[in-house]
Amino acid sequence: MIKFFNKVYRRRKKVSNTGKIERATIMEVDNFQVVESYKQLRTNIMFAMSVKDTTIVELSSSYPGEGKSITSANVSIAMAQTGAKVLLIDCDLRKSVQHKIFKV
């Protein structure tokens, strides 16, 4: 499943030869299975939040390149699509990428 996500979500930039990876959000992907996977993850997180009366979700990992940024962006988009208030904070002070994902 992870290899499937890597193939769908990571594509080489056509303009730059730097080898950087462009990340696509669920707003840009036409693959139904990928979008539904993130919506299922959103539903599971929202259910767990309602059971424990939690308002904060943290995604973390000890290794770089495991998909924390794109997963948090896509889960945030999926939650916002339900009408929930979402505040996504990029706490990676050295290599922040959320502004690149959302093109701001």
Q: For each predicted feature, which ranges?
A:
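Generic secondary-structure transition motif, activating predominantly at the C-termini of alpha-helices
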Residues: Y9, R42-I45, F102
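Long, basic/Gly/Ser/Thr-rich N-terminal segments
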Residues: M1-T18
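C-terminal boundary of histidine-terminating zinc-finger modules
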Residues: S16-T54, E58-S60
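Walker A/P-loop NTP-binding active-site region of P-loop NTPases
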Residues: S50-V104
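Short, mixed-charge, low-aromatic patches
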Residues: M1-F4, E28-E36, K68-S76
